[in-house]
Amino acid sequence: MARPEPKATGRAADFNLRIAPTMVELAPQVVISTIAYNNKVPGPLMRMREGQPVTVEVVNDTDVPEYVHWHGLLVPSEVDGAQEEGTPAVPPHGRRRYQFVAKPAGSRWYHSHTAAMMDLRRGSYTGQFGFLMIDSANDPGTYDQEVFLALREWEPYLTTTDQDEQAADPNDPTPEKPATPDPRPNGLEVSAPLYSINDKMLGAGEPLRVQSGQRILMHLLNASASQIHRIVFSGHRFQVIALDGNPVPAPQPVEIIEIAPGERVDAIVEMNQPGVWILGELRDVARRSGMGIVVEYANQQQRAQWLPPKKSRWDYTIFGKTAPHPAPDQTIDMVFEKVPGGPHGINHWLVNGKEYPHEREFVFRQGGRYRLVFHNRSDDSHPLHMHRHLFELVELNGKPTAGIKKDTVIVPAFGRATVDMVADQPGLTLFHCHIQQHMDFGFMALFRYA
């Protein structure tokens, strides 16, 4: 029997989202079932002006409550889309309106913020994500084409194989590495057999068609629930101009972009190598399983080429500047540790010795300047996300920098990062690892304003 349509109220919304089951054809004879917005993966591009009041009407056509998180936006707790902050759910077969002012300008995104736990058909394991662009007068310069590329994997499953996708370099600093390794065996982790950029596996969709001499503005988003990816555009370089939607002080050309769940990278690419090329994952197994797209110059018909990069290192700090940081009002040390789950269990995570949920909260005073020091005492890399605020990177593994503003930062295995932030968004504020399994099993904390 058909359910009644939930009733809308008030004026027409600026944007409408419908959460519902859908089928996605990743490639011929490769069709997967997921949950998505408006039967599309990614969901519809939301484009708005900075400072614009926005109303988004969300209809939930599933049997479970849902939350839509406006990632990277400076919005009140009650609309941020996190249950832990007190945002109301979009009820099953009901609707909810999110109303906020669009800020700050830049590449943002929206996605499910529902806990999945052991159900790999919920939360960020699904196709519930989309790009959100907030335009301002400060544009990235002239470009001929704008492209949105979301990185995804599909059909997740639990495995005993270590899924930390950031290949450790033996020369990397490990300031947080313990003298004695933990002898306990790891628990089950999440892997996936299928990969795509947007909704197509490599070679299955239309190529990205370009012309020699064009400047292409690429918006890259890692919409994965579990994996860090390293992206290469064969024969070309990325001129990185923004991280997490925020312009960098020193744009730089790089051969590889390392991007963790939740992160965005904006880059200009000069089309100066006519041919047919592959833009895709550095790791052969991920690229051959679908993570890539063909880029085809006009009047070029040959087989797509893949060329590995000469340099494969990624370093946030090259995009920063040298400048002193104002002294913080308070320094908060945050120590992250893993409790291994064993071969048939799940790893659990501690923040300062506590697994979420717990009674301990970190406290901000409005207007205060805080220095957060992230100590990663685990053998996994973690993309750490602060809701409703931006922070500035101060140092990474002892390498200083300034001017790089983000909302999500990778802290490497046994590594350390320091960020500065101003407490200027009153209300409960969620902090967590953006790997869904880590978040679900303890890697979260709440900040509240005094």
Locations of regions flagged by a protein language model:
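Acidic-aromatic/histidine active-site loop/patch
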Residues: 145-214, 221-224, 339, 344-354
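Short, hydrophobic/aromatic beta-strand segments
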Residues: 28-30, 64-71, 111, 227-234, ...
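Extracytoplasmic/lumenal soluble domains of exported proteins with redox or metal-associated functions
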Residues: 2-110, 114-119, 124-125, 130-131, ...
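Extended terminal and domain-junction accessory segments
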Residues: 2-16, 119, 124-168, 249-381, ...
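Short, conserved beta-strand segments of beta-strand-rich sandwich/propeller modules, principally
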Residues: 55, 97, 107-109, 217, ...
